[in-house]
Structures are given as C-alpha cells and as structure tokens.
Amino acid sequence: MKSKHLALLLPLLFLVGCSDPEQRPVVQQVKPPARAQGVDLPTDAGRVAQYIKGSGLDFVARYYRKPDSRWPALSANEARVLSALGLNVVAVWESHSHKRDYFTYGRGYWDAVAAARQAKGVGQPGGSAIYFAVDFDATVADMYPIDQYFRGVTAGLAASNGGSPEYKVGVYGSGAVCDAVKRAGLAQYAWLSNSTGWAGRSFAGWNIRQGRPYAHLGFINHDSNEARDDYGGFRLAGM
C-alpha cells in the first residue's frame, strides 16, 4: 500500500519540483534566414558571372524582350553559365513598360506569349516566375489598364501551355502597382522599384526590392536588389 501511495505522489512531487520560479524554460533563438542579394542588368551577365559570384551575390535578374530591342535578351547560354555557378536567375519581361498608354489586355496577352516562348527556349523550368514590368509612377487612373494588362498576361501564359500556365506571374513596379496587382490575384510575386518618389514606396509585400546598396560592382548599368523568401528565381535543370 505504501508503495502504491508513493507511486501516486511521484507525479505531484515532479510538478512541485519543476515549479521553481528560477527555473525558466530555455528558448532557442532561431536566426532568421539571410536575405538574398543580387543585381539586375540589361546586358549579357555571362561575361561577368564569375565576378558577380565572387562578390558574394545570390541572383541575377535578366530580361526577355521583343526582337527589335537594342538590348540583348536572356539567352540559354547565359542561363547555363549563371546556373553552373550557383546563381539564381530572375526573369523579367520588359517592352514599352514606361508608357502609360501601352497597357491593354491585348498587349498583356501577346507579351506573355512571347515571354513564355523565350522562357522555354532558355530552359526556364515550370513553376518559376516571369515578372512583367510597369516602369512609371502609375496613378489611380492608370490601375484599370494595368489590371487589364495583367489579365491578358494570365490568359497568354495559359494559352502558351495548353490552357494551364507553366510559369507564375510577377509584377515589377511602384508599391501602388505591386499592391493593386497582387490584391487582384493577378501576380504571385512583387518586385518593388527603386524609384523612391513613386506612389506606395512603403509597400511591405515585396519579394524583391530594388536599390538596396549591397552590390558594389565595378561595372555600370546594373541595379542592386535584395530578395526574401521565395522570389521566383530559377536555375536550369541539373545545375
């Protein structure tokens, strides 16, 4: 009987022993993941890829473009060089994105078709993102045409892959544009422009933010960027 009573008392004694106010649970401090650092540039990054990697950067943003652009589009060879070095590639479509009157449903559709064609030619894997640029300080009056443009983008990406989009959609632009397009469910990723005077600069829902002074590279024509979480970048398969 005594042993039975002792057995019943043991859990209580254990609880009393652990109730010492000086014995506080140890909380392990988990270090948040470091943000990725990268650059975007309008020219072939393959020629400076080693330098970019050696500078401690994580990703390079490069452009898909129309054939008549004076700037070179991202190529398959360039993507291979970057991927082989362990650099992620961020793809962005840019055409006449600085013009207010450019944004229509039809242009969004055909831009997406062209971007998807180039992405497949490069070998960009499905499930990664293509960002589409809105490169001016859009007002409230501009939001409806921009909305229609991104609805066209969604339809164009779907049409390019048998009715089901192969690539996710990102939006590049002011905080106001990023917020509006994401709220409408028309983009999964947002890339906040470095133009500090544009509307919505305090937008906090970005995946990439342009203009952070992390990259100090010895060549011109590039912008520094930081990224967090999943930002839609990719490497070619097998690299």
Regions found by a protein language model. Give the residues of each.
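Functionally critical loop-and-helix segments that line ligand-binding/catalytic clefts
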Residues: Q29-A45, A49-I52, C178-M239
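Bacterial signal peptide processing site
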Residues: S19-P21
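C-terminal motif of bacterial Sec signal peptides marking the signal peptidase cleavage site
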Residues: L15-G17
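Substrate-binding cleft of extracellular glycoside hydrolase catalytic domains
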Residues: K31-D44, R62-D142, Y149
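Aromatic-lined carbohydrate-recognition surfaces of secreted/lumenal glycan-active proteins
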Residues: S160-D179
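Bacterial N-terminal signal peptides that target proteins for export
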Residues: M1-L6
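Hydrophobic faces of well-ordered beta-strands that scaffold small-molecule active sites
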Residues: R35-V39, F59-R62, V89-V92, S128-I130, ...
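Long, well-ordered alpha-helical scaffolding segments within enzyme catalytic domains
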Residues: V113, D142-S164
